[in-house]
């Protein structure tokens, strides 16, 4: 039954005043036992669930977003037709019109909504929502007011209006709905404030978000307290005027202007047809509810808090069955949003004072960007062309994107962000069209900044391009950047690019006139890290002093800005866990006042958070200290001079006019603690430690071995100060001409290694530590000063060193008092350090062989162990190291 017929039957029933009360009373008596459940069934209350992913392929994707999924039985019981519009009403009063679509096997009593639909209506899976067919007419919307954010106020409203009317033609809108459209490659979200129909009726604006949220919270709280209260009883306590004729609950709630009457009944469009006898049932519901309202009002004079809430949220609206849709002739008016939202947005804007450690880069960027945008006439008067582009390059996490956002916020320019891979399309010409749209919009809304992130993915070198799409994209971007200066907005549009692979960019893009300036955003040093930490901890409660902050900045080698931010977050979690561990039942308000970050929290967090550049090559630094190595005090001193002194006392080296040693080579017989010394150095220095085994770099493919060497040094520079440890260097740096392998792989690797250690590009804050037991096989070019400055011979341990080794071993072993340490030292004259440890281990095993419950290691066990473990370094090899030391002139310690 159409809306007109429903009105006609209602009028006929109203004229028969004598029959109305009787019908109402009979209806009320018949429904009294189960009024709440019947009302919920007829109102179409369903449970929200997620939209099914597998939908009919015949349905266009653009149309699938406007569908809701229902079961066939649910649609039949609710009188919902296939493909017809339905009204969704949530508990908080938000309404939206969608199209019903049946799904085979869909569970009954549920409605499938997309994530966007759930967000628009304000529901989540499991919530209750009312689904009703549109019983009435749909008119053309003559006028519509939409809210536009303040940053979009300068857009061409005429073009945006055309885009909205073209893409949303036929969509039924209500006040408070959100409209989504893509304009010049950028998504827009507009809120409908007011709708005026062709009949002259005006649907007013919705309540503010804060009011709606407050009402929703109050409603949820009241519903929890009165969950047993039936819906019919709640509705019966609403205060309605006697002169109003209530319509069916299945019609939507929309605010209307009572002064405006229907003037366009000739263009009404019937949306659904009710069943033949459905109007009679509707009349019974109306009269029954009318009687319930009147009887309840007589017996309940005072309203509870829940009743006043219901009266406020529902009684303030009227019922109407007229809806309005967008057409090509609808007039769209754009209004600015509330200024309160602006103030909230300003709190999260990135500014210059929030960026630490990049003062010199920020100064250069501001000179290039701010002057042309703020004072374009100055450049014109001197005839200086304004820069068109600035390229920021550096490792990930150093702050390139953050700088772009800060510049846009400080200058007040419009920002368009292009993420390289996002605009790439498989369709011919679509990627170039998106680029043209973005540049056209930026030109229209000048001053503007176009920020292209991951520029290397969008514009790689055309020589190595795999397909024609990449070449066309590069050509389009070159043309668009050349066209910036010829536009009316000369100097008002600037392209800001960011990449961590500048060598992969096309050469034509990096020439002056396109990207006029290239600024490196590198890994911060200790002073920069201190500045970053101070900025990050400015609003964080902590107990760190200036000295502790300086210590933390000095120890955070290789950490970039993003790593330090994650480090602060992890330290905060450590502090929170520390407080909750002591007082687990503390309320949240008191916990917030007690949580203060300390240096211990930061040190604990540094064990879990490693520099991002070290994650792919991170190794577990062994827990070996200098005290675990017996003797060798002079070697420890030499290593401290080469590694720790340049970091702790840089002014001393500057005062003396010398450079710290670049490389240290440890050579000597096997088992003399060369690798163990490297482990202790990695642990004691606290530097980033890269352990490289010589054979690991060798690869059977041409060029891969050299690339592995380059990558190793590149990573070391990225996390400087750092140590590269080459174990078994003789396998990697063999003397040139001695390699018999095909293609002279060893020679090429050696050449790459020599270039990296002392080539045109200076190796700064990276120390080379190598170990070998065959120094005669290493190429002489690698052994010269400037590459390997310190060559240290690690001989067999002398008597004093053997005493220290035995003491370290006896410290953790139950040794009997009859064991004579001096005698053991004399008996192990030609033993290496590893062999002495083997003697102690063998003695302990012999004691366990005699008695598995043994508590002491006796002298006889050591005597038997010495006969089992004999020196494995022959006299000839010892003589070889001594002769090599004398002939080569290498100094010993």
From Swiss-Prot:
It catalyses: ATP + H2O = ADP + phosphate + H(+). Residues 11-25 have a biased composition (Polar residues). ATP-dependent chaperone part of the 55LCC heterohexameric ATPase complex which is chromatin-associated and promotes replisome proteostasis to maintain replication fork progression and genome stability. Required for replication fork progression, sister chromatid cohesion, and chromosome stability. The ATPase activity is specifically enhanced by replication fork DNA and is coupled to cysteine protease-dependent cleavage of replisome substrates in response to replication fork damage. ATP 1 binds at residues 394-401. Residues 1-10 have a biased composition (Basic residues). Changing residue 323 to I: Reduces protein stability. Keywords: ATP-binding, Chaperone, Cytoplasm, Cytoskeleton, Deafness, Developmental protein, Differentiation, Disease variant, Epilepsy, Hydrolase, Intellectual disability, Isopeptide bond, Mitochondrion, Nucleotide-binding, Phosphoprotein, Repeat, Ribosome biogenesis, Spermatogenesis, Ubl conjugation. The modification Phosphothreonine is found at residue 272. It is found in: Cytoplasm; Mitochondrion; Cytoplasm, Cytoskeleton, Spindle. Changing residue 626 to C: In NEDHSB; decreased protein stability; no effect on interaction with AFG2B and CINP; affects cell viability. GO terms for molecular function: ATP binding; ATP hydrolysis activity; preribosome binding. Residues 1-26 are annotated as: Disordered. The modification Phosphoserine is found at residues 274, 279. ATP 2 binds at residues 668-675. Belongs to the AAA ATPase family. AFG2 subfamily. This is ATPase family gene 2 protein homolog A. It comes from Homo sapiens.
């Amino acid at each position: 039954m159409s809306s007109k017929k429903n009105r006609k039957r209602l009028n006929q029933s109203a004229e028969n005043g004598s029959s109305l009360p009787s019908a109402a009373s009979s209806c009320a008596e018949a429904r009294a036992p189960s009024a709440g459940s019947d009302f919920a069934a007829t109102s179409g209350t369903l449970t929200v669930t997620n939209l099914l992913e597998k939908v009919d392929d015949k349905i266009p994707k653009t149309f699938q977003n406007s569908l809701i999924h229902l079961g066939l039985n649910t649609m039949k019981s609710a009188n919902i037709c296939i493909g017809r519009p339905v009204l969704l009403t949530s508990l908080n009063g938000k309404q939206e019109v969608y199209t019903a679509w049946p799904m085979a096997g869909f569970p009954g009593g549920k409605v499938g909504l997309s994530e966007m639909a759930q967000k628009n209506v304000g529901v989540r899976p499991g919530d209750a929502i009312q689904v009703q067919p549109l019983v009435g007419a749909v008119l053309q919307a003559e006028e519509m007011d939409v809210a536009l954010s303040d940053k979009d106020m300068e857009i061409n409203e005429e073009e945006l209006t055309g885009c909205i009317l073209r893409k949303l033609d036929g969509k039924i809108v209500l006040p408070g709905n959100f409209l989504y459209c893509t304009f010049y490659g950028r998504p827009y979200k507009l809120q409908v404030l007011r709708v005026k129909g062709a009949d002259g009726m005006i649907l007013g604006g919705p309540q503010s978000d804060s009011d709606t949220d407050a009402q929703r919270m109050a409603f949820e709280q009241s519903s929890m307290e009165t969950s047993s209260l039936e819906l019919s009883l709640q509705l019966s306590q609403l205060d309605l005027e006697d002169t109003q004729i209530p319509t069916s609950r299945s019609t939507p709630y929309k605010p209307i202007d009572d002064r405006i009457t229907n003037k366009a009944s000739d263009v009404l469009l019937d949306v659904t047809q009710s069943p033949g006898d459905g109007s009679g049932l509707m009349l019974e519901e109306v009269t029954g509810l009318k009687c319930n309202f009147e009887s309840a009002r007589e017996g309940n004079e005072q309203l509870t808090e829940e009743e006043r809430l219901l009266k406020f949220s529902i009684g303030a609206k009227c019922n109407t069955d007229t809806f309005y849709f967008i057409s090509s002739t609808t007039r769209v008016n754009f209004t600015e949003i509330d200024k309160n939202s602006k103030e909230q947005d300003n709190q999260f804007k990135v500014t210059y004072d929030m960026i630490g450690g990049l003062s010199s880069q920020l100064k250069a960027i501001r000179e290039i960007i701010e002057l042309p945008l703020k004072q374009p006439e100055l450049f014109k008067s001197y005839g200086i062309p304004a820069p068109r582009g600035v390229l920021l390059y550096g490792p990930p996490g150093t702050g390139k994107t953050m700088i772009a956002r800060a510049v846009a916020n400080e200058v007040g320019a419009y920002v368009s962000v292009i993420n390289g891979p996002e605009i790439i399309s498989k369709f011919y010409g679509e990627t170039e069209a998106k680029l043209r749209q973005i540049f056209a919009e930026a030109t229209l809304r000048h001053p503007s900044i176009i920020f292209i992130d991951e520029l290397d993915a969008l514009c790689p070198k055309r020589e190595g391009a795999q397909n024609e799409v990449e070449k066309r994209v590069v050509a389009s971007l070159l043309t668009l950047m050349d066209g910036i200066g010829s536009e009316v907005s000369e100097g008002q549009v600037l392209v800001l690019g960011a990449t961590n692979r500048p060598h992969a960019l096309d050469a034509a893009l990096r020439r002056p006139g396109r990207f006029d300036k290239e600024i490196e955003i590198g890994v911060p040093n200790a002073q920069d890290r201190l500045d970053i930490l101070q900025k990050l901890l400015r609003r964080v409660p902590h107990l760190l002093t200036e000295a502790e902050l300086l210590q933390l900045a000095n120890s955070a080698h290789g950490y970039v800005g993003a790593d330090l931010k994650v480090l602060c977050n992890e330290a905060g979690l450590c502090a929170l866990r520390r407080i909750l561990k002591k007082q687990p039942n503390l309320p949240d308000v008191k916990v917030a006042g007690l949580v203060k970050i300390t240096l211990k929290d930061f040190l604990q967090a540094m064990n879990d958070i490693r520099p991002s550049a070290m994650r792919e090559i991170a190794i577990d630094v062994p827990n070996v200290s200098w005290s675990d190595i017996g003797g060798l005090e002079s070697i420890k001193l030499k290593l401290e001079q080469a590694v720790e002194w340049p970091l702790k006392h840089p002014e001393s080296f500057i005062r003396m006019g010398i450079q710290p040693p670049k490389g240290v080579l440890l050579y000597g017989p096997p088992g003399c603690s060369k690798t163990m010394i490297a482990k202790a150095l990695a642990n004691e220095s606290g530097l980033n430690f890269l352990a490289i085994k010589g054979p690991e770099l060798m690869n059977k493919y041409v060029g891969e071995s050299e690339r592995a060497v380059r990558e190793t040094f590149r990573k070391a520079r990225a996390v400087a100060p750092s140590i590269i440890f080459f174990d078994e260097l003789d396998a990697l740096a063999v003397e040139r001409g001695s390699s018999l392998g095909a293609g002279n792989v060893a020679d090429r690797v050696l050449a790459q290694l020599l270039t990296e250690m002392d080539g045109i590009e200076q190796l700064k804050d990276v120390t080379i530590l190598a170990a070998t037991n065959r120094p005669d096989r290493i190429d002489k070019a690698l052994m010269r000063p400037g590459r390997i400055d310190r060559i240290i011979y690690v001989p067999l341990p002398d008597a004093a060193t053997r005493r220290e080794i035995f003491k370290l071993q006896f410290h953790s072993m139950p040794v009997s008092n009859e064991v004579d340490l001096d005698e053991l030292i004399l008996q192990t004259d030609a033993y290496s350090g590893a062999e002495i440890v083997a003697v102690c281990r063998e003695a302990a095993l012999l004691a366990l062989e005699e008695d598995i419950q043994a508590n002491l290691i006796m002298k006889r066990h050591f005597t038997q162990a010495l006969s089992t473990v004999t020196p494995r370094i022959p006299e000839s090899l010892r003589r070889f190291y001594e002769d090599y030391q004398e002939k080569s002139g290498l100094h010993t310690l």
